[in-house]
Amino acid sequence: MDLGDRAEDSTIDFKFPTRNVSAAPATLAGTPVISVYKANGTTESVAGVTLTVDFDGKTGMHHVRIDTSADAFYAIANDYDVVITTGTVNSVSVVGYPVASFSIENRFTNVNQINDVPVIGVGTSGDKWRA
C-alpha cells in the first residue's frame, strides 16, 4: 500500500491485515516487529515505529504508527518500505512481507499549476491566467 509522499517530521498512521490460509483474519504472532528500509539499502530501522497487533480487539487488523521525527534515519528525498521483520501467522513465518511504502518530500511538485489548471501567473487580486 502506497502511503504517499509525506512532509518531513510527520507522523504516519496506517492499518494492514493478516489472514490464514483459508483467508480468515488471523493474529500476527511470534513477537512481531515492523521495520523500515530506506531507499535501496539493506539497513532497517525500528526508530519511531509502534505496532499494535489486533487493533481495537479486531483479530487480523493491525495498526502501525511511524513518527518520522524520531530519528535522522528519516530524511527528505528518500523512499521507504515498511516490512514485517519478525512474526508469524498461524505458525507460518511472514518475515519479509512488505506492508506499506512511503516517501518523504521525494516527489515532483508542479508549481506551475493551481488546482490542476496550468498557470502562467497569478494577479494581485488572485485571478489566474491560463497557459
Regions found by a protein language model. Give the residues of each.
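Polar, enzyme-active/binding microenvironments
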Residues: 1-131
